Amino acid sequence: MNKRYLLLIILVLVASVLVNANTAPKQTQKETQMSDEIFITNENVNKVIDSLSKSIPEANLFRIERGAQQVASLWRKQDGTAQEYEAFCIENFVADNESLSQLFNKLERNFEIFNGYFHKIDLKLKEPLQLDGPAIQPIDMMFGGYDVSAHLNDDMYSSKIAFITALNFPFYSLDEKTELGNDWTRQEWAFARMGDRFISRVPAHLQQHISRTLTNADAYISDYNIYMGQLLNEEGDKLFPEDMKLITHWGLRDELKSNYADTENGLEKQRMVYKVMQRIVDQTIPQQVINDGTYEWDLENNKIYAEGKEVSATPELDKRYEVFLGNFHAMKQLDPYSTHYPTQLDRAFDGTMEVPKKDVEKLFTDLLSSPMVKEVAAFIESRLGRPLEPFDIWYNGFKSGGGVPEEELSAMTSKKYPNAGALEADLPRMLHELGWTKEKANEITSLITVDASRGAGHAWGASMRNDKAHLRTRIGENGMDYKGYNIAVHEFGHNVEQTITLNDVDYYMLSGVPNTSFTEAIAFLFQKRDLDLLGLKQTNPHDDYYLALDNFWSSFEIMGVSLVDIQVWEWMYANPDATPKQLKEAVMSIAKGVWNTYYADVLGGKDESLLGIYSHMIDYPLYLPNYPMGHLIDFQIEQQVKDKNMANEIERMLTQGSIIPQLWMKGAVGQEISIDPLLNATKEALDALR
C-alpha cells in the first residue's frame, strides 16, 4: 500500500495545529455555510430543460435533465443569480457529438496537467515527513500538512470550468453504471468518469483541515516504533536483536510471522509480540517505550527500567483513539457537501470502492462462517503440533520457502540491497523474471524510482503520464532486511500497476484501477513471488494447494479486522460526540464481539481485542476492507494467470482501466468478485494434503 507512522517530539505542535484548524476559520466556516446553500429551484431547472428541449434533438434529453440538475446542486449565490444559472446552462450545453468530444479532450488534457503538477508539489513537500532523514521539525509538519490543491476546486467553480463539465457530462450512480456500463464504449466510459469529476463542492478551508488531520495521523503512526531489543520476558531475558526497531503494526506482525521458522525461541517471541500488541490496543503501553530505546520493558508486569533501576511508567492513555477520532471528525465534515454519498461509509464503498457495503460484508461473513475455517485451523494445528493461540491468525507456514530462517533471508537481502539505489537498479531484472520482455521491463521501471522511507514503506504513483512513481521502502544502516524486502516487492507491484494504468490506458479519465483492492491484488501477486526473485524458487507439486490455503487464511485474518473497522465507523456515526476513552472502549468491545463470533472457537482467547491493532484504522480511514477484497481478486487473477505469461495477462487486465469493479472482473477473469473459487480451491487443497 500506499500507504502509510508516531511523532511524540511534536505533540504540542500537533495539538496546536488541530486547535488552529478548529478555531481559526470559524468565521470563514460560518460565511461559507451561508454561501453554500443551494438556492436554485426546480422552477429554474425546468426552465433550462424546457428551453434546451425545444432546440435540441430528443436524444439529448437525459443529458439535459441530468446536467441542469447537477449544475443546480453545485451553483451558489457567489456564482450568479438564478437567471444567470439559466443563461449559463442554455449557452454552454453542447449537443453535437463532435463538439462534445472536443470539449472532453480539452478538459481531460488540462485536468491531467493540474493533477500531475499539484501531485509533484505535494510529493516534494511531504518528503521530510516520509523519507529517511533528519528529525522532523515543526516547519516540516506545516508544509507537509499543506494541501496545495485545496483551492483548485474553488477555482474550477469560480471560473465556471466545473459547471461546464457537470452540465455536459452527467453523473451516473453505481446502480446506473452497473446496469448500463456493460454496453458502453470506451469513450462512453471515459465520459462517465468525467461526470464523476464534480459531484460535491467542498470548501478549501475544510480540505486543508482534512489534509492536516490526516498528515498528523500519518506522522503519529510513522514514528510508532518499538525497540524490540529492550523487551524483557518473564525471566528478565532479552530475546530480540539489540538493534531491532519495529513499526506498529506492520513490523510487529511481520516479526511474529517470521518466528514460525524459529524452533528454539520462536513461540516465546511470538507471545511477547502478542503482548506488545495487546498493550497498544488497550493503551496500557508505557509512553516512554514508544519510539525510544532508552528503557527496558518488562512486558508481563508492564514495568520499565533505566540502567537497571525501575522508572515510573506513564501509560499512553487514549492518544491512539484521539487520533482516530480526529480522522472521524475531519471526514464527517464532508457529509453536508456530498449529496450522492452523504457519509464516509457511503463514500468509501459506493463512491470509492464502487462495491456496495452490504455486498462486501456478505462476502466477508460468508467466508468467516464457512466450515472451511475449522478445517484449515485443524490442519494448521496439526502442522504446529500445539493448540492454536490468537496470534496464529498470522500463521504463514503455507508460504513456499517458509522454513528458511529470516536471518538467512535478511543476510541475502542486506548484501544485495545495501541502499535504495541498489534496489532501483535491480527492478528491470525483477520485472523481466516475472515475464515482461526486457524492453517493456526497462520502459516500466524507467518510470519508477526508489526512496528510503521513514515509515514502513508505500508506493506513490504519478498523476500524469511519463512522470515517475515512487517506491518508498525501509532500509537500515546494514542494508535492507527481509521484512523490508518483502514489503518493497509488494510496493513494487503497486508501482507497476500505477505505471501501466497511467501510461498504457487509452483515456486519462480511465487511468488507474477500479479501486484500491485491485492494486492490492497486483501487489499481492508480486509479494508472493519475493523468494522467486531471490533465486529461492522451489518447484513443489503442492504449491497451488499451499497458495490456496495461504490466501484463505490471510483472507480469514483481514476480513475480521475489516468488519471491526466498518462497525467502529458505524458506531462513531451513531455516537458523534464520543470521547477518545469511549471510542477506545467501543473499539475493544467491537473487536471482542467479532472475535467471539468468528475466531474464538478456532483460535481461543475469548474476548480478545487483537483485531484492533491494525494501524490502518488510525492512519487511513476505512481503507482496510480493500485488503480482503484484494485477496479475493488476487486469487481469481492468480487462477487466471496460471500456466500463462503473467505479464501478458496483467497487461491485458490492467489496460481496462478504471471501469467499475464487477465489470473489470468479468473482463479479466470471466466472473464477478466471489469467495467460491477460493473456498473450492481450499477444500481441494485440504483433501490433497491431509
Which role fits each region the language model picked out?
Residues E406-D467:
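Auxiliary, metal-adjacent structural segments of Zn-dependent hydrolase domains
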Residues D532-S615:
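Long, amphipathic alpha-helical stalk/connector segments used for oligomerization, subunit docking
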